[in-house]
Amino acid sequence: MVNPTTSEVQPTMGVKIFSAGVSACLADIITFPLDTAKVRLQIQGEGQASSTIRYKGVLGTITTLAKTEGLPKLYSGLPAGIQRQISFASLRIGLYDSVQEYFSSGRETPASLGNKISAGLMTGGVAVFIGQPTEVVKVRMQAQSHLHGIKPRYTGTYNAYRVIATTESLSTLWKGTTPNLMRNVIINCTELVTYDLMKGALVNNKILADDVPCHLLSALVAGFCTTLLASPVDVVKTRFINSLPGQYPSVPSCAMSMYTKEGPTAFFKGFVASFLRLGSWNVIMFVCFEQLKKELMKSRQTVDCTT
């Protein structure tokens, strides 16, 4: 992600992974209500999720959830979300530069677009497989409603892991890996590569210095591009993960059912919520990530100088 100047020390792989994990967790805590609103909007209109309550827009969904199910509902599934970022974002973001450098080893020129995309594909794919159980639990906790006397499927995050593994199967914790892999390959490549290219263009053309305003603008552009490309796969992933056993035989059948029953616009349900969430998440995560890397390396230099 644009190498630091010669006067700066390159962050180590450990610093990048730690910084990515901490920054992603902070971003998740702040933006989680938007993510919950996105999930509710995405499953709206689905058979098992239908109810007398209709969600209208992002703020309307958040307000309705707070009024009908209580403010804590906006953070239902947060522990799984934090676990997801620790196991997922720390790897896909923290390893991106190192994998990119590996693909570019032996070359004096900067990493090509192909190398950047390859790095995004590899880190995103590995992270999805490791973090998929946390994604399944997070989505199900966000989707379940406590209204109309409906008994919730899960009483908490760890109860959800246990119930899913014992009543469905252990493999169900990896349910939806295919659409989630597709989604996160798109997200990882688009998000990291767009951020990398945008930041590089701003810094190399001396439009902005490699500082907070540059990181903020690059993150916003990356967030919009990512949401636009990933939204259809994201909706299918959410529907499939949240589905009851046997409701959809496969991922394609889930997508086809959405198309025939709700039309093509169903694939962009919750788009505004997705952008608000991903855009703000990107800004918080990337700005914190860049600053934390710098501060950790400064601290390390200070320690090295005193020893």
Swiss-Prot record:
It comes from the Eukaryota. Expressed in brown adipose tissue. Solcar repeats lie at residues 11-102, 111-201, 210-295. Has no constitutive proton transporter activity and has to be activated by long-chain fatty acids/LCFAs. Inhibited by purine nucleotides. Both purine nucleotides and LCFAs bind the cytosolic side of the transporter and directly compete to activate or inhibit it. Activated by noradrenaline and reactive oxygen species. Despite lacking canonical translational encoding for selenocysteine, a small pool of the protein has been observed to selectively incorporate selenocysteine at 'Cys-254'. Fatty acid 16:0 binds at K56, K269. The keyword Ion transport applies. GO terms for cellular component: mitochondrial envelope; mitochondrial inner membrane; mitochondrion. This is Mitochondrial brown fat uncoupling protein 1.
